[in-house]
């Protein structure tokens, strides 16, 4: 399971260090793709295969299903961590997520998300105010 928030830099070649806490679970190869809310999603190869199976079940007759699958899969790339724990984020994904020099990497259960630091900060501030309301509407924690 992925959890936590980490600040990292991107170099001029689009390389970013993967948080040490995430490296073992992600392994040397994993998939990154366009996410929602202008971030990138990162999945283990096992989780990626499970998502692919679910999405293959979507009806091709639905235009929105076709659109989503095209965007999600066309942006996907299998990345490889080097010996320093860095990955190279392709230009098309950097542009999609607005990544430049500073990134925030967060763990979200079965995936990681890679955000431009400013976009994450703005999203966090906006969502922090709604956190309790969202929780009340979506989740019965049964504590």
Swiss-Prot record:
Q: What InterPro entries does the record point to?
A: MraZ, MraZ_C, MraZ_dom, MraZ_N, MraZ_sf, SpoVT-AbrB_dom, SpoVT-AbrB_sf
| Residues of the SpoVT-AbrB domain | 5-47, 76-119
- Highest rank taxon of the organism: Bacteria
**One biological process term in Gene Ontology:** negative regulation of DNA-templated transcription initiation
Instruction: Report whether Transcription regulation shows up as a keyword of the record.
Output: yes
Q: Where in the cell is it found?
A: Cytoplasm, Nucleoid
Q: A Gene Ontology CC term for this entry?
A: cytoplasm
Q: How does it assemble?
A: Forms oligomers.
Which PANTHER family does this chain map to?
TRANSCRIPTIONAL REGULATOR MRAZ (PTHR34701:SF1)
Q: Report the protein name in the record.
A: Transcriptional regulator MraZ
- What is the species listed in this Swiss-Prot or TrEMBL entry? Macrococcus caseolyticus (strain JCSC5402) (Macrococcoides caseolyticum)
């Amino acid at each position: 399971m992925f959890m936590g928030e980490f600040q990292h830099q991107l170099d001029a070649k689009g390389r970013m260090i993967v948080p040490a806490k995430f490296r073992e679970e992600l392994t040397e190869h994993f998939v990154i793709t366009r996410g929602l809310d202008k971030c990138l999603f990162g999945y283990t190869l096992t989780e990626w295969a499970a998502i692919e199976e679910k999405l293959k079940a979507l009806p091709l007759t639905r235009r929105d299903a076709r659109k989503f699958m095209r965007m999600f899969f066309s942006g996907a790339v299998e990345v490889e961590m080097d010996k320093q724990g860095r990955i190279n984020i392709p230009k098309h994904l950097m542009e999609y997520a607005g990544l430049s020099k500073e990134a925030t990497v967060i763990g979200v259960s079965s995936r990681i998300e890679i955000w431009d630091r400013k976009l994450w900060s703005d999203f966090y501030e906006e969502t922090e105010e709604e956190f309790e309301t969202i929780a009340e509407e979506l989740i019965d924690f049964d504590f």
